[in-house]
Amino acid sequence: MASESDASSIATLSCARCEKPAHLQCPKCIDLKLPREQASFCTQECFKAAWSSHKSVHVKAQLSSIGDQNSDLISQGWLYCVKKGQARTPKLPHFDWTGPLKQYPISTKRVVPAEIEKPDWAIDGTPKVEPNSDLQHVVEIKTPEQIQRMRETCKIAREVLDAAARVIHPGVTTDEIDRVVHEATIAAGGYPSPLNYYFFPKSCCTSVNEVICHGIPDARKLEDGDIVNVDVTVCYKGCHGDLNETYFVGNVDEASRQLVKCTYECLEKAIAIVKPGVRFREIGEIVNRHATMSGLSVVRSYCGHGIGDLFHCAPNIPHYARNKAVGVMKAGQTFTIEPMINAGGWRDRTWPDGWTAVTADGKRSAQFEHTLLVTETGVEVLTARLPSSPDVYPWLTK
């Protein structure tokens, strides 16, 4: 609604719609510091009648502001990511963006100290052992020694994710979240597994609003009302621990809150059936049933996975119904469950950076993930929340 302005300040101005003497000014134009000539109106009725076309002035001004900010960043060495992290460009790639978000420039790759043990992709971006391992086809039964290493690694990964959660608020960039993840991982003696994995340029994934997964931390500042998923994987003592959570940024609308809550419940319900003898394909049935009951959809392009000394290996864990996942759970197996749930349809597209998966319809998406160990009697959540974990979900009690 237009606000009344000091009469003397607009006495010489005309209505932007009908050219009658102006008495009101658009408050959004005032906030954006736009010229008063295009912000002035004679009456509320005239302002409302002009709104459908007038609001485009705000969008253009905001895009121009973003362009100016990004130009400053590019002059400081920040560039847009393309070709799955193998190249950079100073120009925003052309793309039919599905929602309000667009790519932002990213900072240079963060450095890992020489003394930190590194996976085989750390230097040249190419995993050597993982794609050729027999464990891409056979689900490994972990030894007690491997399980103990995984417990240690997953606890570190949880502590790193909690550190990231504590800095999330409006105005923080996802690049800053990545810095926190990187430094916390290094401080614990670990390596951030995503860094340079098939050339992924950052130490964690940050997926905002319509981004489903694999969002690259960048210069965009989180805004009040956003939701953001932070996905952390730590490599420590030769094995990996993987988890993620979706967080609220400031005051989030009820539909987004329900999306996040339902996604959390999907993961919890899936974990509840994990025990020896259960077929992997049953996980998708459980997740899909709960999501669709809430009018939501399950992403089909990305799945949970085996994990241990390898970042990704068998089994494959689809989250949708009527999937063809093979195999039965056995004690000693470790894998992730990580449902991605969309407010709209399940289909996705990938940004020009080659990594960022977004909803095809531009609607929001949420995700939660844990690394799990199948025990003789059920399941151990290796990445479970700690007593010290931030209290960020109103439906949880410590």
Swiss-Prot record:
Binds 2 divalent metal cations per subunit. Has a high-affinity and a low affinity metal-binding site. The true nature of the physiological cofactor is under debate. The enzyme is active with zinc, cobalt, manganese or divalent iron ions. Has high activity with zinc; zinc cofactor is transferred into the active site region by the ZNG1 zinc chaperone. SUPFAM superfamilies: Creatinase/aminopeptidase. PROSITE patterns: MAP_1, ZF_C6H2. Its cofactor is Zn(2+); Co(2+); Mn(2+); Fe(2+). Its EC number is 3.4.11.18. Zn(2+) 3 binds at D231, D242, E369. One of its GO terms (cellular component) is cytoplasm. Zn(2+) 1 binds at C15, C18, C42, C46. One of its GO terms (molecular function) is initiator methionyl aminopeptidase activity. The keyword Oxidoreductase does not apply. Belongs to the peptidase M24A family. Methionine aminopeptidase type 1 subfamily. This is Methionine aminopeptidase 1A. The lineage of its organism: Eukaryota, Viridiplantae, Streptophyta, Embryophyta, Tracheophyta. The gene is MAP1A.
